[in-house]
C-alpha cells in the first residue's frame, strides 16, 4: 500500500497555498533506500526530486551500526521551494530532522515530513524544539501503528488514515 495519496491529500488540506509544480515543490528522499518512494511521489506530482546520501564511517561501529558522518545532498536548488521528505519510518527522528535542517540551510520554504510508520522512539521533545525553531511545517504519519494521545495533540502533527485501505486487504 502506497500512502503517497493520503500524504498529498492531507498536505494540501493544510497548505492551501502550496503550488504543485516543479518551480515550487520538490520531493526528497532522506537516503538512498527511500528513492523508490520519492520517485513514485515526484512522478505522480510532476515535480523534481532530490536525495541525501548518508556518508558513513565504515571503520567504526557504534550501537551495531556505522555512524553517519555527513548527509550529502544530490539534487536541484531548493531555495524558496516547498519540500516533501518521504521515508518509510521515523524511528528516533534524528535523520529526518537532520535532513530538514540541511534543507532549511539551503533556504527551502516549507518542509513536510512524511513517513508511513511514526514510532518516535526518542520521544517528541526534539520535534517540539525543531518545530519551535521553524525547521519544519508539518509531520505526517499513517495510523498503521499506534499514535499516542501526546503525538495526536501536537499542532504540527497530521495523522493520515489508511484504515479503509488496510480493510481492503482482508476482504
Q: Model-flagged regions — what are they?
A:
Residues 1-169:
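PRPP-associated nucleotide enzymes
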Amino acid at each position: 500500500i502506497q500512502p503517497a495519496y493520503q500524504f498529498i491529500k492531507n498536505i494540501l488540506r493544510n497548505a492551501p497555498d502550496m503550488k504543485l509544480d516543479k518551480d515550487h515543490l520538490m520531493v526528497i528522499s532522506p537516503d538512498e533506500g527511500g528513492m523508490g518512494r520519492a520517485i513514485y511521489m515526484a512522478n505522480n506530482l510532476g515535480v523534481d526530486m532530490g536525495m541525501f546520501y548518508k556518508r558513513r564511517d565504515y571503520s567504526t561501529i557504534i550501537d551495531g551500526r556505522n555512524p553517519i558522518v555527513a548527509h550529502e545532498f544530490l539534487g536541484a536548488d531548493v531555495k524558496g521551494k516547498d519540500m516533501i521528505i518521504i521515508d518509510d519510518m521515523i524511528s528516533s527522528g534524528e535523520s529526518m530532522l537532520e535532513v530538514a535542517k540541511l534543507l532549511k540551510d539551503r533556504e527551502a520554504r516549507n518542509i513536510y515530513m512524511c513517513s508511513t510508520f511514526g514510532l518516535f522512539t526518542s520521544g517528541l521533545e526534539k520535534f517540539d524544539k525543531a518545530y519551535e525553531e521553524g525547521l519544519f511545517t508539518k509531520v505526517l504519519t499513517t495510523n498503521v501503528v499506534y499514535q499516542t494521545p501526546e503525538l495526536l495533540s501536537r499542532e504540527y502533527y497530521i495523522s493520515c488514515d489508511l484504515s479503509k485501505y488496510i480493510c481492503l486487504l482482508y476482504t
